[in-house]
Amino acid sequence: MSNIYANSYLIVFVFLCLGVLLPIGALTIGRWLRPNVPDEAKATTYESGNIPFHDSRIQFQVRYYLFALLFVIFDVETVFLYPWAVVYDQLGLFALVEMIIFIVLLAIGLIYAWKKKVLRWM
């Protein structure tokens, strides 16, 4: 019986090794075979054929990332709330209590973000 489990893990290990080694091998072979001709024009930013005036990289302030992260968190909340609301009648009291706990935890996170003034745009 343990031989069956060992064979199962062996197959998973083989696929894991293949999944890691094949992309690494393909990238390595591609690096060896491609022509490498560095040029200043290749390193510049492409702006519709125009010569760029300055560096195209713009640094965003951290608060924009926090705002986007909060948006993603509450967007995922709606993904969980919608199916629950659709089948609310069939789930019963246990699912209602679980969803209330979920909403309370997210509300605590929202209140914390509000107190830390993450939601203040300017």
Swiss-Prot record:
Gene Ontology molecular function, alphabetical: NADH dehydrogenase (ubiquinone) activity; NADH:ubiquinone reductase (non-electrogenic) activity; quinone binding
The protein's name in its UniProt record: NADH-quinone oxidoreductase subunit A
Known catalytic reactions: a quinone + NADH + 5 H(+)(in) = a quinol + NAD(+) + 4 H(+)(out)
Species lineage: Bacteria, Bacillati, Bacillota, Bacilli, Bacillales
Subunit architecture: NDH-1 is composed of 14 different subunits. Subunits NuoA, H, J, K, L, M, N constitute the membrane sector of the complex.
Gene that specifies this protein: nuoA
Enzyme class, first EC level, given as a word: translocase
InterPro entries: NAD(P)H_OxRDtase_bac/plastid, NADH_UbQ/plastoQ_OxRdtase_su3, NDAH_ubi_oxred_su3_sf
EC number: 7.1.1.-
Transmembrane region(s): 10-30, 67-87, 91-111
UniProt topology in membrane: Multi-pass membrane protein
Species: Geobacillus thermodenitrificans (strain NG80-2)
